[in-house]
């Protein structure tokens, strides 16, 4: 599958934006927004409903036992309560991750488990994970005209059953850093057998709840059974609902099971040659769900199959990772990547992501010079700025505003737009720190800015986690000039550390950053990744100049406190996910408790050498 970027689908027409929407009414930090079809008589294609986070009624609430000092908040699960939820995805942090998908499958499941649900996450075994054990359970999976044997590895962490599908197509391809080799040998290059690999994942995931006898949790025993909700994530799991309906339900298996499909990035859809459909071993009934025609010649010209399209059409509920991104997806071809009409048909619900507040905690962060909370942030951030300036080789002066950019160096994140705005910013008394890795052309571009403006710009084009933490703590403003951003994590991390964001007005950035309260909005940027629009450069430069003028004022200090006083954890999003999944009506499902997540005691993932 070759990546389909929004630049390939950009049109000359204006996109879907928030021209005068600096503080949109849909901005509910822990709310969710559902878009459902109206009847034809309704006129508009969609109707919009906004619902705030709901709390369980007293009858629904179950007891939570507060544990010892070592375990400050331990959930006690009630046997038979809640739901059986099975997440399936190609990534699962911290074991495997290239972006937001891995973060969601790493962070959301523990939060749902804390609410009393039995939760499993299924992902490929890309490496020799030392904390995952061989269950000795195997399954025979039919792929094309042959059968492949998969094994199931397992570990139980933070209240969640983590299941890894073991097969040579996953394990033998990934050497070095797992995140760099999940989908192909190099960035932008896919493995030719990705259809086979992820077909294996989908079919093995359907076997796991029935055959894995898991007894790690004292309140949940045995297999998950058949009354489960499968939560599929992105194109790699698109065929799962079809396999469920084709291979299981006609035989009386999983009769009550339901499937939710979550879109993390519409730009990657799993488009393959139409002639490959028989290799999926699905009946003709499902061919139309995969059938897709576009005007591009990758991976082949003309008619194709589209895994994400099938995932959307065959699911019982479609979701995405922020309310505003849901609006963008149905707004037209440019932002819906040719599936906008399908999503207008099915409806789509947006729920904002949370973040790992234990890993990113300025009151305990070992990588920063001065630890702090909302009450001590102003002085502590000044000390951290001085440490950051020294680390970056910039003049140490806490009075100089410091802007930071952290992100993957690819078109979506706008590093080229950021670089183009730097010359205009050099007119100001300002320092800029750039951190990221990715496409070589962008790495060279950022380094050229450092060479052109020594003493004012520093570019680090390598992975450096300690520096990322110090930047969050020491920067005055975090620049997020994304062309599109389904949800975004970087702005959440910045606000967690009291760093207001200057961001593009797209996707989850609209739902999480409030103009004048927690950050600054640049407006909508072009989704055309092939060019840097001069108007976009002006928007980025003007917004950052506006932010620079606020730094050091009482208004800025208030913004810092506003950022830090938010609950950015997964607790609110998990409750919204619970409400949506309960609506699917799987037999035996019940609302969860008001619990707290079990925090990890140590680093979870250690791969073998």
From Swiss-Prot:
Superkingdom of origin: Eukaryota
EC class (word): transferase
Bilayer-spanning residue ranges: none
Disulfide bonds, paired cysteine numbers: 337-529
Transit peptide region: 1-77
InterPro entries attached to this UniProt entry: Glyco_trans_1 (IPR001296), GS/SS (IPR011835), Starch_synth_cat_dom (IPR013534)
Residue numbers binding ADP: 100, 408, 413, 462, 493
EC number: 2.4.1.242
Keyword Transmembrane assigned: no
Family of this protein: Belongs to the glycosyltransferase 1 family. Bacterial/plant glycogen synthase subfamily.
Protein function: Required for the synthesis of amylose in endosperm.
Protein name, per record: Granule-bound starch synthase 1, chloroplastic/amyloplastic
């Amino acid at each position: 599958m070759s990546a389909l970027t929004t630049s390939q689908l950009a049109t000359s027409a204006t996109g879907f934006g928030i021209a005068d929407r600096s503080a949109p009414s849909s901005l509910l930090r822990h709310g969710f927004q559902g878009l459902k079809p109206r009847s034809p008589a309704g006129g508009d294609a969609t109707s919009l409903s906004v619902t705030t986070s709901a709390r369980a009624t007293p009858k629904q609430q179950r007891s939570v036992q507060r544990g010892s000092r070592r375990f400050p908040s331990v959930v006690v699960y009630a046997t038979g309560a809640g739901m059986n939820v099975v997440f399936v995805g190609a990534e699962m942090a911290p074991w495997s991750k290239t972006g937001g998908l891995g973060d969601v499958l790493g962070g959301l499941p523990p939060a749902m488990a804390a609410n009393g649900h039995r939760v499993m996450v299924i992902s490929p075994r890309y490496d020799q994970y030392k904390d995952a054990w061989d269950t000795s359970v195997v399954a025979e999976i039919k792929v094309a005209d042959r059968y492949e044997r998969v094994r199931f590895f397992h570990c139980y962490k933070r209240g969640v059953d983590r299941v890894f599908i073991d097969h040579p197509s996953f394990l033998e391809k990934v050497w070095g850093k797992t995140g760099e080799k999940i989908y192909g040998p190099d960035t932008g290059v896919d493995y030719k057998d990705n259809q086979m690999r992820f077909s294996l994942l989908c079919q093995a995931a359907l076997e796991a709840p029935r055959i894995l006898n898991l007894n790690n949790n004292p309140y949940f025993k045995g297999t998950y059974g058949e009354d489960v909700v499968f939560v599929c994530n992105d194109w790699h799991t698109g065929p799962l609902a079809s396999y469920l309906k084709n291979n299981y339900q006609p035989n009386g298996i999983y009769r009550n099971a339901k499937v939710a499909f979550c879109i993390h990035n519409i730009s990657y859809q799993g488009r393959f040659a139409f002639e490959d459909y028989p290799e999926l071993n699905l009946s003709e009934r499902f061919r139309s769900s995969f059938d897709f025609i576009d005007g591009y010649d990758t991976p082949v010209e003309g008619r194709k199959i589209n895994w994400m399209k099938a995932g959307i059409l065959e699911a019982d509920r479609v979701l995405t990772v922020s309310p505003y991104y849901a609006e963008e997806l149905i707004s037209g071809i440019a932002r819906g990547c040719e599936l906008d009409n399908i999503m207008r048909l099915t409806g789509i619900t947006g729920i904002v992501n949370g973040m790992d507040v234990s890993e990113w905690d300025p009151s305990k962060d070992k990588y920063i010079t001065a630890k702090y909370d909302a009450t001590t942030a102003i002085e502590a951030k000044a000390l951290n700025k001085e440490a950051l300036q020294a680390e970056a080789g910039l003049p140490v002066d806490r009075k100089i505003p410091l802007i930071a950019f952290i992100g993957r160096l690819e078109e979506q994140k706008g590093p080229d737009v950021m670089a183009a705005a730097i010359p205009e910013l050099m007119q100001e008394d300002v320092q800029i720190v750039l951190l990221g890795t990715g496409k070589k052309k962008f790495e060279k571009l950022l380094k050229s800015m450092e060479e052109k403006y020594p003493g004012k710009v520093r570019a680090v084009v390598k992975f450096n986690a300690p520096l990322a933490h110090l930047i969050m703590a020491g920067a005055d403003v975090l620049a997020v000039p994304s062309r599109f951003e389904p949800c975004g994590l970087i702005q959440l991390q910045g606000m967690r550390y009291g760093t207001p964001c200057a961001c593009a007005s797209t996707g989850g950035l609209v739902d999480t950053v409030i103009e004048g309260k927690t950050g600054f909005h640049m407006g909508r940027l072009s989704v055309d990744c092939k060019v840097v629009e001069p108007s976009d450069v002006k928007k980025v430069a003007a917004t950052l100049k506006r932010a620079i003028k606020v730094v050091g004022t009482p208004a800025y200090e208030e913004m810092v406190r506003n950022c830090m006083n938010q609950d950015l954890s997964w607790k609110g999003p998990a409750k919204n996910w619970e409400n949506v999944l309960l609506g699917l009506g799987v037999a035996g499902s019940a609302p969860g408790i008001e619990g707290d997540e079990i925090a990890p005691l140590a680093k979870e993932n250690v791969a073998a050498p």
